[in-house]
């Protein structure tokens, strides 16, 4: 969730962030939120990745009768967003959970886990707030403790991964989660270095990565630390496992006519989203039949042509939106009893 917060009428707000693809998200979710009332009366929306609350604030202002369920695993984000969204507190249920906690969040809000929600938004990945907080260890441009936990109250740190994982496991996560070509070489260097001195801060890791990646690749492949930091963050936070559970839970939660928007920032996330929504947007009837068999039709229709990208203008105003891939779907039929 590269959390680009901001007012919908200006590039940035007092928080200094811009919500990514804000107007496109509204364009896609708005019809579902206003199906019964142009002010959002009777509609329930889930912001599965609240962050600093920029997207949520826009929807709460635009639809003054909308009910919002706001999820985030970062207690600090919930605290900041809670203050920001205080004027709308009577319409919000805040839940401290990962985005695969949708079912429990709905239970806390007194709603069933299936077909009770009209709109859901996922803005995946690390938030701008987390990148900008120097003590969190997410940014390779800042020397900081190697933590990388989105919820700093639980779980292992990036330093623990570096200092305790076997060579094979390190190479696996670097290759799988970071799509790093030099995963084996980097893993060997990590094991060699930690035998001399355990990793504690990001500067030592960045220095190692500069040594490990060939100069020719560094010149053309972006910052040498980018892929390794991504891989560590995904491993520390269990991001892909969480997403694999969250997408079907979100689809199940939508009522007929309800819509979901996913904004991914890396190919791994986008692949998970696509793999989950595509099968449920296809007929299950045998090919060649003149009519659709009862209960075998598609549950969803895809609202986007492939994965949409940010416009040149948006990227210019907000460089962190450059990698975004947006997909959206609408429930068109109830889930088959089968």
UniProtKB/Swiss-Prot annotation:
GO biological process, one term: rRNA base methylation
EC number(s) per entry: 2.1.1.199
Reaction(s) this enzyme catalyzes, per UniProt: cytidine(1402) in 16S rRNA + S-adenosyl-L-methionine = N(4)-methylcytidine(1402) in 16S rRNA + S-adenosyl-L-homocysteine + H(+)
Superkingdom as given in the UniProt entry: Bacteria
Keyword presence, Methyltransferase: yes
GO cellular component terms attached to this protein's record: cytoplasm
Annotated InterPro entries: RsmH (IPR002903), SAM-dep_MeTrfase_MraW_recog (IPR023397), SAM-dependent_MTases_sf (IPR029063)
Keywords: Cytoplasm, Methyltransferase, rRNA processing, S-adenosyl-L-methionine, Transferase
Region (Disordered): 276-297, 304-323
Location in the cell: Cytoplasm
Annotated residues for binding of S-adenosyl-L-methionine: 53-55, 72, 99, 123, 130
MF terms in GO: rRNA (cytosine-N4-)-methyltransferase activity
Pfam families: Methyltransf_5
Predominant subcellular localization, coarse grouping: cytoplasm
Family of this protein: Belongs to the methyltransferase superfamily. RsmH family.
Function: Specifically methylates the N4 position of cytidine in position 1402 (C1402) of 16S rRNA.
Alphabetized PANTHER family for the sequence: 12S RRNA N4-METHYLCYTIDINE METHYLTRANSFERASE (PTHR11265:SF0), S-ADENOSYL-METHYLTRANSFERASE MRAW (PTHR11265)
Protein name as catalogued: Ribosomal RNA small subunit methyltransferase H
């Amino acid at each position: 969730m590269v959390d680009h917060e901001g007012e919908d009428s200006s590039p940035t707000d007092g928080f200094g962030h811009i919500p990514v693809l804000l107007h496109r998200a509204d364009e896609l979710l708005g019809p579902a939120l206003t199906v019964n009332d142009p002010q959002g009366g009777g509609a329930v929306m889930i912001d599965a990745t609240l962050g600093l609350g920029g997207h949520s604030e826009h929807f709460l202002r635009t639809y003054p009768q909308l009910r919002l369920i706001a999820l985030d695993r970062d207690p600090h984000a919930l605290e900041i967003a809670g203050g920001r969204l205080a004027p709308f507190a009577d319409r919000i249920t805040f839940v401290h959970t990962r985005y695969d906690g949708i079912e429990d969040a709905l239970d806390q809000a007194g709603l069933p886990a299936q077909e009770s929600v009209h709109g859901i938004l996922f803005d995946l990945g690390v938030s701008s707030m987390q990148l900008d907080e120097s003590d969190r260890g997410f940014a390779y441009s800042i020397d900081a403790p190697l933590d990388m936990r989105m919820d700093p109250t639980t779980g292992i740190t990036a330093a623990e991964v570096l200092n305790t994982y076997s060579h094979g496991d390190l190479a696996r996560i670097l290759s799988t989660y970071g799509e790093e070509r030099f995963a084996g070489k980097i893993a060997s260097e990590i094991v060699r270095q930690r035998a001399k001195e355990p990793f504690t801060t990001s500067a030592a890791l960045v220095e190692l990565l500069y040594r490990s990646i060939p100069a020719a690749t560094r010149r053309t492949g972006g910052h040498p630390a980018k892929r390794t930091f991504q891989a560590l963050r995904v491993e520390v936070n269990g991001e892909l496992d969480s997403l694999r559970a969250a997408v079907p839970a979100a689809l199940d939660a939508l009522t007929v006519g309800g819509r979901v928007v996913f904004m991914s920032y890396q190919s791994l996330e986008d692949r998970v989203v696509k793999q989950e929504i595509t099968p449920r947007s296809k007929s299950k009837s045998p090919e060649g039949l003149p009519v659709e068999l009862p209960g075998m039709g598609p549950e969803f229709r895809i609202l986007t042509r492939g994965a949409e990208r940010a416009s040149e203008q948006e990227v210019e105003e907000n460089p962190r939106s450059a990698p975004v891939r947006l997909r959206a779907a609408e429930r068109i039929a109830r889930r088959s009893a089968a």
